[in-house]
Amino acid sequence: MLYGRERFYMTGNIVIFVTDQRQSNLAACLPGKIHRLDWRRGVEKEEALEVLDNSKYLVLPVPVTKIERNHDVNFILKEELTGKKERDWILFGGVFGPEWRQRCEDAGTEYYDMMTDAVVVHRNACITAEATVAEILKYSDYSIRGQKIIVSGYGRCGKEIARVLSAMGAKVTVLARSAEARRLARTEGHEAVDFSYGPEEAYGARTVVNTVPALVIREPMIREMHSDAVIIDIASRPGGTDLMAAETYGIKVVAALGLPGLYTTKSSAKVLADAILEHSKIRQDGKEAKTWIYQIAI
């Protein structure tokens, strides 16, 4: 029988599926009593259903597809969402793909994609920028101050990364397709050019940070890089770098995915927790918590 089931059954219990340190820290940011479970080596369906039957809020990873790494959990969730039993769940997660969105909509299950929240995206970008600095210092042989650094893309993360690097004394050049993005980058004090000038700008740069989830760091640009240059690619898979060209020319590429789940993970968890509390009725009333948080390692 579940821990605390009789006492807390109708109070909106929470399930957090833990795939990284950020998810692990998330429980401490939410009101409730924490009970830890470990399903990494498999889970009995009866136990899983008992947890799910007693929960209102399911917090999936960022991105949501990380749940698919655990076959048992992924299968049970899919089965329950598409089954005949009506589920009064609210799902939280980041980057719900078309399949997950369709599954929730077909089941009439409410879901909230935290990575569509402007506040979450901005705070996440700030953390990502700091983490990117850590990655540069870890993999580059050069200090940031005085270094020419190329930032590929000028979206939320690109803007924040360029701002932080510039504040640290880097000579930042932004690559952006949009004329408006280039204009904005220049108003912030950066050099800014179209991607067609990438090869020319690559000469003399020792670090390239890519934020674009499309193939933009191509062979002509990689060919011009110095042998000790490094590419920090933070874009979602498959990234934006021609890996074969990088291997051919001996250029180091670091696939720096999910940085908020690796760095400053308590701050990163607080960002998600604030969004969950903002879009739910989870609250701690009185001196004693009335909610159980099932923190499940998968």
Residue ranges and their predicted role:
Residues I14-N25, R145-L165:
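Glycine-rich adenosine-cofactor-binding loop
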Residues V59-R145, T265, A275, I282:
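Glycine/serine-rich phosphate-binding loop and adjoining beta1-alpha1 elements at the start
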